[in-house]
Amino acid sequence: SSHNPGQSFTTGTTTTVVYTATDAFANVGQCAFTITVTATDTTPPVVTVSSSTITRQVEVGTPGVNVFFTEPTATDNSGQAILISRTNQPGDFFSVGQTIVTYTFQDPSGNPASGTVTINVIEVDTTPPVVTVPSTTITRQVEVGSSGVNVFYTEPTATDNSGQAILTSRTNQPGDFFPVGQTTVTYTFQDPSGNPASGTVTINVIEVDTTPPVVTVPSTTITRQVEVGSSGVNVFYTEPTATDNSGQAILTSRTNQPGDFFPVGQTTVTYTFSQDPSGNPASATVTINVIEVDTTPPVVTVPSTTITRQVEIGTPGVNVFYTEPTATDNSGIANLVSRTNQPGDFFPVGQTDVTYTFQDPSGNPSSGTVTINVVEVDTTSPVITVPSNTITREVELGTPGVNVFYTEPTATDNSGIANLVSRTNQPGDFFNVGQTVVTYTFQDPSGNPASGTVTINVVEVDTTPPQVFVTTGEVVRTAPFGSSGVNVFFTEPVAIDNSGTADLVSQTAQPGDFFPIGSTVVTYRYRDASGNEATGTFTVTVEEMVDTTPPTVTVSGGNIVRTVELGQSRLSVIYTEPTATDNSGEANLVSRTAQPGDLFPVGTTTVEYVYQDPAGNEGRGQFTVTVIAVDTTPPSVNCPNNVFQEVELGTSSAPVFFTEPTAFDISGQANLVTRTAAPGDSFPVGTTSVSYIFSDNSGNEAEPCTFTVTISAVDTTPPTVNCINNVAQTVQLGTGSTQVFFTEPTAFDISGQTSLVTRTSAPGDSFPVGTTSVTYIFTDASGNNAQPCTFNVVINAVDTTPPTVNCANNIAQTIELGSTSAVVNYAEPSATDISGTAFLVSRSSSPGDSFPIGSTTVTYIFSDQSGNEAPPCVFTVTIGTVDTMMPMFTSCPNNIVQSVELGVPGTVISWTTPTANDAAGIASIVSNLQPGSFFTVGESATVTYVATDNSGLTDNSCSFTVTVFAVDTTPPSVVCTNNVFQTVELGTNPVQVFYTEPTASDISGQANLVSRTNVPGDSFPVGTSTVTYVFADNSGNTADACSFTITVTAQDTTPPTVNCITNIVRTVELGTSSVQVFYNEPTASDLGQASLVSRTAQPGDNFPVGVNPVTYVFGDNSGNQADPCTFTITVNTQDTTPPTVTCISDITRVVELGTTSVGISYTEPTATDISGTATLDSRSHTPGQNFPVGSTVVSYFFSD
């Protein structure tokens, strides 16, 4: 080396030390480092503060101000003192209160020094209070002639930035008496700094007139009559008039006037008087009734005059629903008064007349008739017998179908005839594989159809097992020496089946499975959908490789480092010896350069262990043992005593200077590592712990030197008092004093503790009417007294008792029936008050007002001059009527004569119910017989009506007679036959047709067939023929002719017969996506013309790999479509190309002489295949494995 430890080096210089090492083969290595010796400066800078305290004033409520000042400066023995921090700077914003600004300087050796400037920002109050007036103008009304009124209002208040604004004067207060006219009330406030502020309230007292005019109505209701259909009439009447206490009442509006046109109905005419000198309004109404008189009967609408319903032959009748007749009337109302039947009633076979009678409110009647015809018909379909609903036949797989013979369905009918009109197939037809539904349709002579079906199932049966293809042959793989086997990948056998599907049901192994060393037989088993099975087998052989792998040596502890005390030359070292493992299971130690417990010199020694396996492969392990001489003794520290210092209470911190700790070390050098504070630093109020830590050049650290700096605060500031506003409270007039509760003033002190020294009153004390001054004085724990807190308690006496009211009793009065209102006079309610004055505020009616029939509520409200309102005085005025007039019939029916059909025993007779009028209203109109009663042929009955009004008075002057006689005018009722439809096979003409003949009935009991154009069993040509029947009764009444049609249709109903083809299979090379396929197309034959309707593919089309269904559909000229012919074209792929392997080049590595093996990493070979997948079956080695010195062959095997 160029230098030795312990050698002397010059201050202020940097020296490079070089170590050189040489081995036995003259290989050289070097280590170099530098040693720098520096002189240390420990004297801090000197700080100069030009002005230690600066004071600025701001307005009360201002948060602070920007302050400019001369900054402290510093000098140092090094000639350089750098400002490293300051808590504020000139021009910064400073909040109200005291702020300490600290400046810290440092010399180039890192010695710090501090100086402080105290900034005091003080609030000064020059702002007057802010006065709030809830309402600047207050208006009160008094009766004309009153001199004034006591007025209550919410007083103005004031706020101030000091938190206290005191009321010093007011020219009036709430509850004072204010004369008629305008009075200005002034309030003056002042804050603790003497700044004044004022606010005013204007009181307006106004005289008003509140009595409305009195209106007189000569006649409240006027009635006029007009003809029905008239829109109205001009009406003349005497108009209402009005008087007022002012001597003047003006008519300001009226909704109509005498001579105006009034429409039919009730019209209310309103007269409004107002605009007396005070503008008080009053209203009155006149009711104009215009009444129509009606003599026109309702108009009846019958939606359907004749309704026909059919019933099964032998059924007596049926319940019939229909839309009922309706009626309209010029009055807007037409009431149904009778009906002989209603929707839903049971009607017998034959004809029934239903009569509806309507009547309007004036008793005018009107009738309408609905005829119900119930006809017997045959609607029962034939009954079909199917010998066998489902027939199943089996065919070989791939056969398109088979001819099937079966017993055909038959049919019977209540008419005795059931004809087969169509069938979709017949016995002996060819049926395709699958399910075919054969439909048979029968029809009776009345055209009622019925159908039956036979299902033909043709099923394919499969007995051929799948064919298994094993493409791999024997599979041979190698396994590393010592392993039990290897995972082997191979191409799996595949299977095909004539059904198109062969499922793998079991396998004894699969690609990637682990195979042991030796030969293993692998078996695959497949099964088709019919349960036919087939197997395929092959052999997998695994061979073991030769051992070339050296033992693996494990050095458990790694390199070893030990220390000795400075001056010792060697050390005995104990360690865990390296171990070795080998794939053969045996590794022997053949040599070692040292062993545990040997003496190792100061410095680094290399230790090597060598192991060998039975095949002679060697493995080596190395580690180093380093012995280092070190210094372990820490420095000795001289620590100072604790430091104590006082500041003003409220000051948060102060700079403190103290003597720093020193240290000594046996090496001659002790360095300050860290310190938590330095002389001149700012310390907060309280106790702060300061720590210094020293260390020597060997890193030995002494125990920390810790001492405390304690800053104590002294209090000289009086408490701050939160005074309260003046307290105001009202009492009942005449009360001398009252107990008052208020929130007491509070105080706050920077010491956190205040006490109440004295108070002149407390919450809950009794205060007299007037103003009482209350004073609170607070002090803190240091005896600093705050300024006294003074406020006023003001007690006001007011009147809160409402007047006492003498209310009137309820009033009842009667008038003649027909009058609508009456004028009522009464003694008005009165009121008294403790103040001596009570006045009427409002009333809903006055004596002499006109009140309508019924009960009217009258309300009076009184108040005193203090605004106390009494509860409302409420009573009722009730106007009743008296009736002395008997009712009078306004209409009565004439005598009634009615004819009925011969054989009918009688009929229901309806008439318009008589009407009657009465001023009191009609309570009831009753009679011995009602409209809609049944009257017998030959009978003459008297009908009498009695009317009674709501007062019990009666009139029985309405009576009339009802007479019924019989006449035959009705023709027979015919039940006609429905149109007949029959189908024959194409080419058949004519055909015999059977049908049910029309029938007729008559009320006389005899209906005769007069003529017919055909009879059942006649032959009819293809096309439509008309058949007519005519009936008459013995009285010569002929019924309308009964006509119906017979339509014979020739129809082709047989679909074409299709010759379908079998499924097609093609094979292509793997990677080919599709192939062109040619085939013979399906064909079809038909009784008429068979044609191809659609096909999903055709010969020569390209078909993709997979199963492709192809469908052909055939039809004939009659629209009969055969079942679709469907077959499949399957395109399979086959792979015969082995994978393409990308191998890597030979690898050569050079190792140190004596090394037996080395780990080698490389990029593994890869393979691709046209199938998209190439699988690694086995490999003799892996990247990173140890390879011995010499040549080793590495093998990789791939397959698809």
From Swiss-Prot:
**Protein name in the entry:** Hyalin
Say if the entry is tagged with keyword tRNA processing: no
| Coiled coil residues, start to end | none
Give the subcellular location: Secreted, Extracellular space, Extracellular matrix
Question: Which PROSITE patterns does this one have?
Answer: HYR (PS50825)
Q: How does it assemble?
A: Homooligomer in presence of calcium.
- Give the highest taxon in the source lineage: Eukaryota
Q: What does UniProt say on post-translational modification here? A: Glycosylated.
Function field: Major constituent of the hyaline layer. The hyaline layer of echinoderm embryos is an extraembryonic matrix that functions as a substrate for cell adhesion through early development.
Q: Which organism is it from?
A: Strongylocentrotus purpuratus
Q: Where are the transmembrane segments?
A: none
Q: Which GO terms describe its biological process?
A: cell adhesion
Question: Which keywords annotate this record?
Answer: Cell adhesion, Extracellular matrix, Glycoprotein, Repeat, Secreted
Task: Please state every residue range assigned to the domain named HYR.
Answer: 1-39, 40-123, 124-207, 208-292, 293-376, 377-460, 461-544, 546-629, 630-713, 714-797, 798-881, 882-966, 967-1050, 1051-1133, 1134-1200
Any single Gene Ontology cellular-component annotation:
extracellular region
User: Among its keywords, does the record have Kinase?
Assistant: no
